[in-house]
Amino acid sequence: MYGFFTLTQLSDTSVTFSKQAFASMNIRSLFSLFSSDLAIDLGTANTLVYAKGKGIVVNEPSIVAINKSNGEVEAVGKEAKEMLGRTPGNIVAIRPMKDGVIADFKVTERMLNYFIQKAHGRKMLVHPRIVIGVPSEITQVEKRAVIDSAYRAKASEVHLVEQAMVAAIGAGLPITEPGGNMVVDIGGGTTDVAVISLAGIVYSRSVRVAGNELDEAIIQYLKRKYNLLVGERTAEHIKMTVGSAFELEKPLTMEIKGRNLIEGVPRTITIGDDEIREALAEGISTIMNAIRVALERTPPELSADISDRGIVLTGGGGLIKNLDKRIRQETGLPVSIAEDPLACVALGIGKMLSDFKLLRRIAIE
């Protein structure tokens, strides 16, 4: 009366409206109300998960230990990496990612599900929107595999972005400005080289030579020269301790323990940085060639910008001793290493969670 609703009428109207609003929501929209958005750097060597409002909450090896007798997951991440080369016959440690893309779909799905649950404190009803970084030259089939794995791991929405682009964002480069930025992201499975301007990739190249390939080169070198067999973890440790891309001012040596392939017993040798540099030479040359090609194909105006701003290195491979010096010598350009190279991709994707306008501009799927 008097043109107003009574309390009962207002209550009835509210209930009707609520029912209509609820009915109009699709399931994904409803789940999103109770979710926390995630940014995932799904790497060949490591997976990093960035939670909106929290930062990086997961940083673990992309490894899953599976029990072959029953197909059960025994361990994921750090715990699974500890098992590499040490598992009993019925347990196998698997890297489900190879060269930056999914090699084992089912294991990747289980790994993703584990990391998503861990990022959300083991909550069961979690259906986040997810943004995932992928290599530049990924095929449609490989894209579909990443998207399907994320949905099967309970994502409500999935977006893909190029790793080189988000690595540049994570390194703090002004990618939306009308000037050239060059980033070289050396991960575990791929090296992505990109020239970026106005939030777009002007040129990009992805080569499947990166950290894991360099580790394998060390393993093969020690086999060939010393008949010494070492595992992946040891090879990675050698690479980061005495590995280099250019002659060091002060020579380094390191004791290496492994199994002699002829005698079949444990042996220890001492190796110098010059030998490991020789082992890494072919892989480093492939990366250098990708950088040279990118520079040759960059438009003149952007080349001038890169001459001023230089090249920025991201990813774990950027930490190889004197790689920046090698690139500087061969290109004549300034070279810098990002402040937190290992986290650049995850940090860059994480920024997209708060800037969906920019995400829409750079997303490739």
Residues covered by each model-derived region:
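Nucleotide/phosphate-binding catalytic cleft detector across ATP-hydrolyzing
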Residues: 2-186, 194-312, 318-365
